[in-house]
Design a protein with these regions (language model features):
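N-terminal lobe of the biotin/lipoate ligase/transferase fold
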Residues: 6-134, 302-305
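Alpha/beta catalytic cores of group-transfer enzymes, especially the acyltransferase/condensing modules
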Residues: 142-146
């Protein structure tokens, strides 16, 4: 079982996995699952390799049992995947590992255009920043494409994957989020990570944090579906989805190095978000605007640019 020590002033806080409070499935279902809440189903399991992989497989094999807003969460995830397929693992009960199945349709029941799907991971990251800030007093920011940061340190990551439909219907999407909740200095997978505990959050109750996130995600997702997945349309009474994300994104305006999946890199200034959620960068060498849809992005200091 994972253990860690958190130093606060002259005190050390010691944690073992079993001392961290567990998720409470019945409490969560009572407040979140229909007809009371917005979820179709909520499954809480002790351990898995990856909630994203599991939920995508369930949705592919028995789609009728996994409608829109089906949720899978785990106390321990042993083979989670991040950007560019990187793996990471945290001690049991120290984080939120949650995946949500989305089958996006507009209010008339028409599927959203698949080109809008690129926004869903950004939307989920936005929902997470909003729910965490409202509950804990910690003010996270977004880093393109899928990181949630506090003062440059990674608090959470979001990853989306398509689930093909064998009957010819549009694919579903599984959006997964991993939020570092009570990780200590000793638990951190990398030195550039952080957790709500380390940021002195007003609460580290994962039941409350999970409920807040899923309720906020549902609100934002429904607003996105109501405008047919148009991220530039007036959205939720407060600008567009793109505007809301841009306001919280620290990448914009930065000089960045983007390592592309197929090799090669682009160095330039991050200008804006494209209509599909990609990152528009002005190449430093050629002065050409390029839209990057997938990359490992590093924010450069002036001396590195």
């Amino acid at each position: 079982m994972g253990e860690g020590t958190r130093k606060i002033g002259s005190m050390h806080l010691h944690y073992s996995s079993m001392e961290r409070p567990p998720l409470e499935p019945e409490r969560l279902r009572a407040s979140l699952v229909a007809p009371v809440g917005p979820l179709a189903r909520l499954d809480v399991i002790a351990e898995t390799g990856s909630t994203n992989t599991d939920l995508a497989e369930f949705a592919r094999l028995v789609p009728s049992e996994y409608p829109d807003m089906s949720v899978l969460t785990a106390e321990l995830q042993t083979a989670g995947r991040g950007r560019l397929g990187r793996s990471w693992q945290a001690p049991e009960r120290s984080s939120l590992f949650v995946s949500v199945l989305l089958r996006p349709v507009n209010p008339a029941g028409r599927p959203l255009p698949t080109q809008s799907y690129g926004w869903l991971s950004l939307l989920a990251a936005l929902s997470l920043t909003k729910s965490v800030a409202a509950r804990t007093g910690v003010a996270p920011r977004l880093k393109w494409p899928n990181d949630v940061l506090v003062d440059g340190r990674k608090l959470a990551g979001v990853l989306a994957q398509l689930v093909p439909d064998s009957s010819g219907n549009p694919p579903a999407v599984v959006v997964g989020a991993g939020l570092n909740v009570s990780l200590t200095d000793e638990d951190q997978p990398v030195p550039t990570a952080t957790s709500l505990l380390m940021e002195y959050a007003s609460t580290t109750d994962r039941n409350v944090l999970l409920q807040d996130f899923l309720l906020q995600l549902n609100l934002d997702y429904r607003a996105f579906c109501a405008v047919d997945g148009d991220a530039t349309a007036p959205w939720s009474g407060d600008g567009s989805l793109r505007d809301n994300i841009a306001e919280r994104m620290v990448t914009l305006g930065q000089t960045v190095r983007a390592h592309l999946p197929g090799g090669g890199e682009v160095v330039g200034r991050a200008l804006e978000l494209a209509s599909d959620g990609g990152l528009v960068v002005i190449d430093s060498d050629a002065g050409i605007r390029q839209t990057i849809t997938a990359a490992d992005v590093i924010h450069l200091r002036p001396s590195e640019a």
